[in-house]
From Swiss-Prot:
Protein family according to the UniProt entry: Belongs to the bacterial ribosomal protein bS20 family.
One of the record's GO molecular function terms: structural constituent of ribosome
Swiss-Prot/TrEMBL keywords: Ribonucleoprotein, Ribosomal protein, RNA-binding, rRNA-binding
One example of a Gene Ontology biological process annotation: translation
Summary of the function given for this chain in its UniProt record: Binds directly to 16S ribosomal RNA.
Organism phylogeny: Bacteria, Pseudomonadati, Thermodesulfobacteriota, Syntrophobacteria, Syntrophobacterales
Keyword Ribosomal protein: yes
Origin: domain of life: Bacteria
Protein name in UniProt: Small ribosomal subunit protein bS20
GO annotation, cellular component aspect: cytosol; small ribosomal subunit
HAMAP family attached to this UniProt entry: Ribosomal_bS20
InterPro entries linked to this entry: Ribosomal_bS20 (IPR002583), Ribosomal_bS20_sf (IPR036510)
Protein source organism: Syntrophobacter fumaroxidans (strain DSM 10017 / MPOB)
Keyword NAD: no
Pfam families (alphabetical): Ribosomal_S20p
Amino acid sequence: MANHKSALKRARQNEERRIRNRARKTRMKNVIRSLEEAIASNSRETALERLKMAVSVIDTTASRGVIHKNTASRKVARLSKRVNAL
């Protein structure tokens, strides 16, 4: 456990950020999962709507620093490719 005042503050900030980042990452995974369900059911209209939402959430997650921007680009590219194949 941290002893110095600044180290205690850092530990507190890290915990708050960890919780926030986990929430963002979970939201991203849930949106991707819903898109994959739409792809599996072969409903193109639903998949396109959910792709738009997924791209938005993935880009936001990357801009917040939760995931790397290249990882975000790769996820978007792969999801777009699957939706376009419908």
